[in-house]
Curated annotation (Swiss-Prot):
GO terms for biological process: endoplasmic reticulum to Golgi vesicle-mediated transport; Golgi localization; protein transport; retrograde vesicle-mediated transport, Golgi to endoplasmic reticulum. This is Coatomer subunit delta. The coatomer is a cytosolic protein complex that binds to dilysine motifs and reversibly associates with Golgi non-clathrin-coated vesicles, which further mediate biosynthetic protein transport from the ER, via the Golgi up to the trans Golgi network. Coatomer complex is required for budding from Golgi membranes, and is essential for the retrograde Golgi-to-ER transport of dilysine-tagged proteins. InterPro entries: AP2_Mu_C_sf, AP_mu_sigma_su, Coatomer_dsu, Longin-like_dom_sf, MHD. Residues 212-229 have a biased composition (Low complexity). Residues 179-197, 251-261 have a biased composition (Gly residues). It comes from Dictyostelium discoideum (Social amoeba). Residues 169-263 are annotated as: Disordered. Its main location: cytoplasm. It is a peripheral membrane protein. Pfam families: Adap_comp_sub, Clat_adaptor_s. The lineage of its organism: Eukaryota, Amoebozoa, Evosea, Eumycetozoa, Dictyostelia. Gene3D superfamilies: 3.30.450.60, Mu homology domain, subdomain B.
Amino acid sequence: MVVLAAAICTKNGKALLSRQFSEMTKSRVEGLLAAFPKLIGLGRQHTFIETENIRYVYQPLESLYIVLITNKNSNILEDLETLHLLAKLVPEYSNFDEYDISKNAFELIFTFDEVIAMGYKERVTLQQIKHFISMESHEEERFRMEEKIKQKEAQILASSKAKEIERMRHEEMLRGKRSGGYTGISGGGGMGSGGMGSNQYRDNDRDNYHSNNNNNNNNNNNNNNNNNNNRDRDRGDSPNTSRPSAASSGSQGGMILGGKSGTNKNSAIAQVLKEEKIVEKVEDVEQLLDSQISQIPETPTVPQEGVHITVEESFTSFVESDGTVESIDIKGGLSVQINDQSLGKVKVNLKQGKLSKQFQFITHPNIDKALFGEQSVLRLRDGGKGFPSGGILKWRCKTNQESMMPIRVNCWPSPGRDSTTVNLEYDSLVGYELKSVFIVIPNPTSNAPIINQFDGLYEYDNKQKCVIWKIPLIDDSNRQGSMEFSVKGNTQSFFPVKIQFTASQTICDTTVGSVFVEDSNQSTNFSTETTLSVDTYEIK
């Protein structure tokens, strides 16, 4: 006998799980595990401890320990190999907390039995053990497939039955409409004996029809007159008609002109979301939709002057889950569009802030590079005919400095007893406005999360299985914000977190100061359109 027991315990020595491979009492196992933490010295780098009779081979698992209790004659290298295999298997079936270990105790014991038999390590791999534990059966799989086929056939049959019922109902409605002009008017019995299609006319024999044709025509005329009078009387006197009035039918299914179509649309969307079980109350989602419409800022249209300058910049960043900035890549460009050809050649004076010194600038070959380097002025070289259409200035900065980020987002999943609480917070690091900020967090389960607290707006995408935190506008009134929700899941399953935003100012802090006509050296009116957008911003 080599391995006496395999166990998982806390750092205080509390036994959470133990599988004995020799005759050992419960009190002895608990005593050995309780003494184990006291034997670990501070700052020790070893993974085993020897006493007079036994050896502890252990490995930390976050706040827990996985321990092999062996005799002193065992092969330490083989024991370490066994320990490492068990350490790889535990996270496949449980999280590293007391509640999950106790909840999945039987699955973990089964894995221990697959690795160790009679105290000796089995020659198995990780994939083989996972296959054994899954206990797949060909008969069971075939039974499941047959059940799925039966369910599909039942769904098809139910669908065909529903279509048949709908078709029959439609035919009955059509037949009712055809006969409604004769039978539907009598309702409360107001037709009388002189109504349309009198008993006298119906009692005549078909053989006598031609001989009595003239008399019948006269009778029909009288009957028609009586019918019209009776119809008018029924409309005025009979309150219980079988056919609803035009006003009531219009109010039920007709289109109301001049109504609030936006409110009706929101109500319809809210009803669909409630039926899909995305929200609990229709009123909540209607209020959310109304607030979204009112709070999302509109993008204004910039009127173009004779000289129109477009500045575009894209932001890319990857951040580790602990907040360490892995990389930041900022790319930008400036283009000039001459709408008034009578201006001729122009030169553009730029204003560059402090952050622009960290960027590398590249000018178009047709631009005077020396003048730009000395005075930050963009003008054509001698002999140039016009500004290139594809842009005249580009810049780029690759860094890992957090100060170059317009907004910083932190995600803190904290595992609990029944669920994981996810805390999110954002912090705007710039003084200008950020618009349409979207923070998307994946949901590892099919259950909708419980939102405990949030700033701004939020939405749960049931199909994509993600929580979307929305902040329509970040300015001086809300430079910081937070959100908290709870849902079951492993801490790493809430990543990557993706962030999107836009702004009307660049990180490079390069703006247009003035535009001059070269021939007259007179300033001219110009318009600018500046956009900062996110290419990729992820917390991994």
